[in-house]
Amino acid sequence: MLSQVCRFGTITAVKGGVKKQLKFEDDQTLFTVLTEAGLMSADDTCQGNKACGKCICKHVSGKVAAEDDEKEFLEDQPANARLACAITLSGENDGAVFEL
């Protein structure tokens, strides 16, 4: 019998100067974690499909994979801006900090 291994981690989200630690499971998007925590609204968005650019956040610290198909939404944004829906979380993101 195969056992399914699920990895967890924690990120910190900062909104309005208030820090909140949020747990995640591998392969969840940052968008999902933030909306489930009530820190980001899914209303009037593409629902995490990398098509609207409304879930921009700032990557403050920690490890995050390089941006890929989100560049068109980030052209006029600071260098640390990312789309929450384009960040798929894994154990390597444990401890990362994002500002909303």
UniProtKB/Swiss-Prot annotation:
One of its GO terms (cellular component) is hydrogenosome. It comes from the Eukaryota. Pfam families: Fer2. Keywords: 2Fe-2S, Electron transport, Hydrogenosome, Iron, Iron-sulfur, Metal-binding, Transport. Its cofactor is [2Fe-2S] cluster. Binds 1 [2Fe-2S] cluster. One of its GO terms (molecular function) is metal ion binding. Gene3D superfamilies: 3.10.20.30. InterPro entries: 2Fe-2S_ferredoxin-like_sf, 2Fe-2S_ferredoxin-type, Beta-grasp_dom_sf. It is found in: Hydrogenosome. Residues 9-100 form the 2Fe-2S ferredoxin-type domain. [2Fe-2S] cluster binds at residues 46, 52, 55, 85. Residues 1-8 form a propeptide. Ferredoxins are iron-sulfur proteins that transfer electrons in a wide variety of metabolic reactions. It links pyruvate:ferredoxin oxidoreductase to hydrogenase. The propeptide may play a role in the targeting of this protein to the organelle. This is Ferredoxin. The lineage of its organism: Eukaryota, Metamonada, Parabasalia, Trichomonadida, Trichomonadidae.
